[in-house]
C-alpha cells in the first residue's frame, strides 16, 4: 500500500489497483501539488463537510465516476450536487468495500458546507475520523478534531499503523493536544496534517515531531509517499 500526503488534509492511498483520496481540497490550496483537473480517483472519502475538506470532490467525482463515501447527510448533499455514486455511512459504522474496510469514528468539530453564492450554510451531519484498513494495515485519518478521551478507545480497539493528526490549532487541536493524542492512539507512525495552509493554523511540524518519542512521528513533505 502506498500513502501520499498532498498538503492540508489531503491524503492519497493506492491499494489493490485502486486510488483513494481523502478530503481532496485542491483548488484554493496553495500547498498542494495536485491538479483538480487531472487527479485520478476511484474512491473519495470525506471526513466532514467543510469547504476545505470537501474541496473538489464534486468535480473529481463527476469526471472520474469515483465513489464518494461520507456520513449520510454529506453523502446526500453530494448527490444533490450531481454526484451519482455515493455510499452513506454514520459515526461508528463500518463497511467492507472491495478496496478496503472503512469505519467512521467520532470527531469533535463542526460539519457544514458554505454556499458562498447564496450565502447559505448547509448542515452536513456529524464530523468524523476515518479508519481505513487494507492489505492488513490500518490508517487513521482524524479529520478535523479536538483532543477527546475516546481516542484512547480508538487506539485500544484498533492497531493503527499510520495516523494523520491535525496540529494547526485554532480550528483543531494544536501540537500539545496532538502529542497527547499520539500517545493515546499508539500508532506505529504519526504524521501531522492541517497546518500552514492559512495564517491562523501556522505551525512547525518538525517541532511537533521532535516532541514525540523517537520514531513515533514523521513529517511528510507535499507529494511525499511512504509504503506500508
Swiss-Prot record:
GO MF annotation, one: hydrolase activity
Q: Quote the Gene3D superfamilies the UniProt record gives.
A: Ribonuclease Z/Hydroxyacylglutathione hydrolase-like (3.60.15.10)
Indicate yes or no for the key word Transcription regulation: no
Identify the InterPro entries for this entry.
Metallo-B-lactamas, RibonucZ/Hydroxyglut_hydro, UPF0173, UPF0173_UPF0282_UlaG_hydrolase
Could you tell me the keywords of this UniProt record?
Answer: Hydrolase
Cysteine pairings via disulfide bonds: none
Q: Which family does it belong to?
A: Belongs to the UPF0173 family.
Q: What is this protein called?
A: UPF0173 metal-dependent hydrolase ABC2731
The species this protein was found in: Shouchella clausii (strain KSM-K16)
Q: What is the lineage of its organism?
A: Bacteria, Bacillati, Bacillota, Bacilli, Bacillales
